[in-house]
Design a protein with these regions (language model features):
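A short glycine-rich beta-alpha junction/loop motif
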Residues: 107, 121-128, 160-184
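A broad, structural micro-motif
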Residues: 36-39, 137, 168
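Sequence-specific dsDNA recognition surfaces
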Residues: 39-54, 65-96
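Short coil/turn segments at secondary-structure boundaries
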Residues: 54-62, 157-159
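Alpha-helix initiation and N-capping motif
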Residues: 38, 60, 139, 148-152
Length: 185
């Protein structure tokens, strides 16, 4: 991207900007090692489209993601919830090994991998779930990268909304490049 630099102003040509937000143009580099090739997160994470309609007479296990790399756990201490008590009727079914993001708490390091005991549980659209291309990256490595202070700061910068409801821009998240060693390493 060609950028003309003046004392107080930076100019970039629109055709050279992959994301038209001012924040993207002036974002700080995350400072990851140059030892490995960089890859966009969207090149190995694909959003799950496994959505269901909640049935009032069925029971469901729900998922939440703890902040500060605290893990992915069952909501309500693992108690099942009747569909009639669930307000959002369209939800996503999760599977073990998928990567999950809390849109609201990504700025606080709320990323994780669905554990085996939450197979088949559900989440709202505020928790995007991604299938991981394990031929390119291990889900645990993505958790490691996404909970570094630099990455959490990136998540904070690309979150917008009112004070306690700032949500990460998932498109910016998927466009972010990270170092990607070979899976064998």
């Amino acid at each position: 991207m060609s950028v003309n630099t003046f004392k107080y102003i930076h100019f970039a040509h629109y055709k050279d900007i992959p994301n038209w937000s001012v924040q993207y143009v002036v974002e700080e580099k995350l400072g990851f090692t140059k030892k490995y090739p960089m890859a966009k997160i969207g090149s190995f994470l694909k959003k799950s489209k496994n959505q269901i309609e909640i049935q009032d007479d069925a029971e469901y296990k729900q998922v939440t993601v703890k902040i500060n790399n605290g893990g992915v756990i069952a909501r309500n201490d693992g108690q099942l919830k009747r569909g009639s008590e669930i307000g959002t009727k369209r939800q996503t079914v999760v599977h073990a090994g998928q990567f999950i993001v809390s849109k609201i708490d990504a700025r606080n390091g709320a990323f994780g991998v669905i554990p085996d005991d939450l197979e088949g549980a559900i989440v709202t659209n505020d928790f995007p779930v991604f299938d991981v291309d394990s031929s390119k990256i291990l889900p645990q490595f993505m958790v490691l990268i996404s909970t570094t202070p630099q990455f959490v700061e990136f998540a904070r910068k690309c979150s917008s909304g009112t004070t306690n409801r700032k949500r990460i821009d998932i498109n910016m998240f998927l466009m972010q490049s990270i170092p990607l060693p070979k899976v064998q390493e």
